[in-house]
Amino acid sequence: MNKLTRARISVEALLGQIQSGERGGTCVFLGTVRNDGDVTAIDYSAYDEMAREEIVRLIDEAQARWPAAKIIVQHRLGVVPVGEASIAIVAAAPHRDEAFTVCRHMIEEIKKRLPIWKKEIHADGTSTWVDPSGKQIAGGLRDS
């Protein structure tokens, strides 16, 4: 289930696909939409095929580096309200240190490389484009 989705992320479903008797450590990272001031939601958009291919490439690279680990990534697209998860990364490995390391590696690489754009939706109905690091784009590109 390494994919993009427009539905709510089910951690239970992801865990059901990854846990096994060979992996004693499982790390789950959830990135949730937070209320920065007057933000009510974030609208995530992507060129789906390119984003899917990059997720697969990122997982393949991590699997080559940590062959005993299993990794699942799921990223939401569309409008995600405050408090809901926009991304889930689940990494299972024989031991907890490896699971934590893989999970951290994945979120850092995703933030650098995954071509997904976000637009903050504000309580007053306006929206602001945000770069992948979370900073508003210079010039304050704000839609009304």
What are these regions (language model features)?
Residues M1-A85, A92-R104, E108-S144:
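N-terminal, polar/charged subdomain of small-to-medium soluble alpha/beta proteins
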